[in-house]
Amino acid sequence: MTRSTTLITPLTTTQRKIGAHNVWGLSNSEIAEAEHLTLETVRSYIGTMRLRLHCPPRASRAVLAHTLLRLKQVPPPELTVRHSFVPDADGRRLIHALAEHSQRGDIARATGIPTGALRTRTDVLVRQAGAANVPHLIGLAHTDGILGAEEPTTATPPPNGPAEAGR
């Protein structure tokens, strides 16, 4: 689980920008290119964000995206021209599990989906949402109120917004 009652260390502006890119579904190499950084620098920033936000050291990109959004460190992705995404109960359960767990076994237990079927079910959900990948799915789930609906996000977008936004 990603919930923690411990206070977080605030992120720097650069960490917020990299976090926003993660929420938009960009890979480390895409982030490095967009921000004119080395791949190792991006990896380092992501590791530091996990520490500052009290995520497990090997937390998935989806768990990091959810934590960034839940703690209001980055704004959710803006709605792009796409159909409205309303997952069924199983889809909602899978989204919540992907947002909270990094290990396939934990996700399978939380959803009741066999481990062997997780990849297929996740890929279908990503396509239905019009997302680029699972971290982007988590971002869109926050935008659509599927996750984090308890209060609106007040974080300000990073300067210039994420590159390739809404692709």
PLM regions: where:
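Basic, Lys/Arg-enriched C-terminal extension of HTH/homeodomain DNA-binding domains
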Residues: 54-82, 127-167
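Sensory/regulatory domains in signal-transduction proteins
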Residues: 10, 24-27
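Short, locally clustered residues in the helix-turn-helix/winged-helix DNA-binding domain
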Residues: 23-24, 69, 96-100, 142
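N-terminal intrinsically disordered, low-complexity, charge/repeat-rich segments that act as generic
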Residues: 12, 16-17, 32-36
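Recognition helix of helix-turn-helix DNA-binding domains
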Residues: 28-57, 103-135
